[in-house]
Structure formats: structure tokens, C-alpha cells
Amino acid sequence: MTDDFSDFDLFWLKSMMENELDLRPPTLAKKSRASKIIKDDQENPIAHVAITNRWQGSEINSLVVDPAHRGKGLSHQLLSRVIGARIFCYTRDERLQSALRKAGYRRKKFPGFAASANLLLTRTAIFAWMLLTLDFKRISHQIRHLPNYKLYMKVNSE
């Protein structure tokens, strides 16, 4: 696992996000200090997690594993690298929900007032971006599945 992020890694990440309509638009994918990536023996990216500060904790806002490498525990490896006092993740993916539970995350209903304010601002901006880029397929998918997204949170003692 590495924090090194090449242009090819970014291209791979965007291609993964293109097919995962639950995630933010691939045009918003970027290199970040908070990103973690797993590469195979040939240095090809096979899994990625992005973490964003949400004022009242950190959000796992995308976690992707290449379909050819699923079932190998890569999401567990990524989750073990996510650090912070308060970490949360919204997902409707049952495999990720299972991995989150195994990593000590618990189902919650509310991320906190400051985190909610931050999420309201950022999700509104992402929605506006999807409108501007005419990403109606992603908008439709996310609105249709909105009630199915579940919040998981882990609070680490300091």
C-alpha cells in the first residue's frame, strides 16, 4: 500500500468512479494527501480510499476496489489505514457495510451538526457540478437510492 499517486493512478481511479454511480463524479477525482492506494506487483492500482475532513470528523467519501481483485480483503486493508478520532462513511453497498462493521464501525443515524453542515454544503456543490456536467444518470441513480445509504461511524479514543 502506498500514498504515492501517479497520473496513471488518477486515470484508473476516474475509470472506476465512472462505473460506480454511488460515488461522486469522476471529474472530481483528485490526488490527495488523505488518499490511500493499493497497487499490485506490477505497480498497477487495484484499490483506493479517499478521506475528507468534515469539520466534526473525517468522511470516507470513496472506496473502490477493482472488480478483478474483489474478495481479497483489500477494503479491509484500506480501512485499517484510515486514521482519525471520528470517521464516518455513507454507503449502500453491502460488502462495504460488512467491511466497516468488521473494522469496528457502527450504524448511526446522525454524523453531528458540524459534519451535517459541511455535508450539506459539499453535497449541494457536487449536485450543482453534476447538473453543469449533465451527469443525469448519476443524479437519477443517487436520488433513487437516497433512502438506501446507511451511515457508519467509528470513534477512536485518543
Predicted regions and their residues:
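Conserved acetyl-CoA-binding loop-helix of GNAT-fold acetyltransferases
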Residues: 65, 70-84
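Conserved active-site tyrosine of GNAT-family acetyltransferases
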Residues: 100, 105
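Extended, charge-rich low-complexity interaction segments
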Residues: 137-147
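A conserved beta-strand-loop-helix scaffold within acyl/acetyltransferase catalytic domains
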Residues: 18-67
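Conserved GNAT acetyl-CoA-binding A-motif
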Residues: 84-99, 111
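Conserved catalytic-core motifs of GNAT/GCN5-like acyltransferases
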Residues: 90, 106-139
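Short amphipathic alpha-helix that is part of the acyltransferase structural core
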Residues: 1-26, 39, 126, 145-158
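Short phosphate-engaging motifs
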Residues: 56, 70, 96
